[in-house]
A protein has these predicted regions:
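...the same signal can extend to comparable exposed beta-sheet modules
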Residues: 1-175
């Protein structure tokens, strides 16, 4: 289930890699299948300037070139919620993330909290290899499974996009 959604300039450049050619750095005409922030899927050629070692299941920042190919940027490693870097797509390798629908914040195991932007996009892996995409404001409160968490912050330190894994789909934010 994917909810179509309005995406803004700050959130449209994020996608989950659904499928990517193995060893794409050395492949001829390598391609990638992305689940974009608006919930649509797209297959595109991989630009040679893309970061290396990108695998399925990662959240990437991307730009589409004039020829239709995509240049993808990997997340940078952060050791904890306190170490998340502004204006960067971060990855926490072993995190539990909670979303609070009332405060519109993500909380990390080290008691760090980060506010989400009004247009924040949540990518949720609710079953292995199955994703939902939704505005974070539309979700009910939830806690992720412990594991990789991708958190992208804007220059002000607010969350613009994130990817976490959960046991099942989070509820919607019915008040």
């Amino acid at each position: 289930w994917v909810a179509a959604q309005q995406v803004t300039e700050s959130t449209k450049d994020y996608a989950v890699v659904e499928k990517i050619d193995a060893n794409y750095e050395n492949a001829v005409n390598p391609s990638v299948k992305l689940i974009k922030a608006d919930g649509t899927k797209a297959t595109a050629a991989i630009d040679s300037d893309s970061d290396t070692n990108i695998v399925a299941g990662e959240l990437v920042k991307y730009k589409t070139n004039n020829d239709g190919s995509v240049e993808m940027t990997k997340a940078k490693t952060a050791n904890s919620g306190k170490n998340l870097v502004n204006d960067t797509l971060n990855i926490l390798s072993n995190a539990t993330v909670s979303y609070n629908k009332n405060t519109k914040q993500l909380a990390f195991g080290d008691n760090t909290k980060k506010a989400t932007t009004s247009d924040c996009v949540a990518f949720i892996e609710y079953e292995t290899g199955k994703y939902m995409v939704a505005p974070s404001d539309s979700l009910g409160s939830f806690t992720s499974k412990t594991g990789k968490a991708y958190i992208s912050l804007d220059k002000d330190g607010k969350v613009v996009a994130f990817l976490v894994s959960t046991d099942g789909k989070p509820s919607n934010n019915a008040s």
